[in-house]
Design a protein with these regions (language model features):
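Mid-chain, well-packed structural core segment of small domains
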Residues: 65-90
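Structural motif
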Residues: 4, 50-53, 69-71, 104-106
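Core segments of cupin and vicinal oxygen chelate
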Residues: 2, 8-50
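N-terminal beta-strand motif that seeds the catalytic metal site of vicinal oxygen chelate
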Residues: 1-19, 70-74, 120-127
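Vicinal oxygen chelate
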Residues: 83-127
């Protein structure tokens, strides 16, 4: 099966957005290629987890803003610590933590540059 192999975070203010993801998720970035382009150091991210994907009806996570393109959800070990880190680094929680039975706890956030993504603490025992 083919799998997603790369994603890109688009930003106007690269230093601010870079700091946000470094502080919230512990990622490290390295300048690579053309000016204004950075690669996430794969050694700074946790080991890969099994691919989880879905297809769904287009929706609004932020009222009046329909999601476009691919929706990215980042696996985290502590959803509440991630929620606090997002807020501390200038992000906004746009969908509060909710529990998906048998899957885990999910939230959606908006980074300081306006990108919307999810964070999921996987837990098969969630109810």
């Amino acid at each position: 099966m083919s799998q997603v192999a790369h994603f890109t975070i688009n930003a106007e203010d690269l230093p601010r957005t870079r700091r946000f993801y470094e502080k919230v998720f512990g990622w490290k970035f390295q300048a690579w290629g053309p000016p204004g382009f950075y690669m996430i150091d794969p050694k700074s991210a946790p080991a890969a987890i099994a691919l989880r994907g879905s297809l769904q009806q287009r929706r609004e996570i932020v009222k009046g803003t329909r999601m476009t393109g691919f929706e990215c959800t980042i696996s985290v070990s502590d959803i509440h610590a991630t929620e606090a880190a997002v807020k501390a680094q200038g992000g906004t929680i746009v969908m509060p933590v909710c529990t998906l039975a048998g899957i885990g706890q999910l939230l959606f956030f908006q980074d300081p540059d306006g990108n919307i993504a999810g964070a999921m603490q996987y837990d098969e025992a969630a109810d």
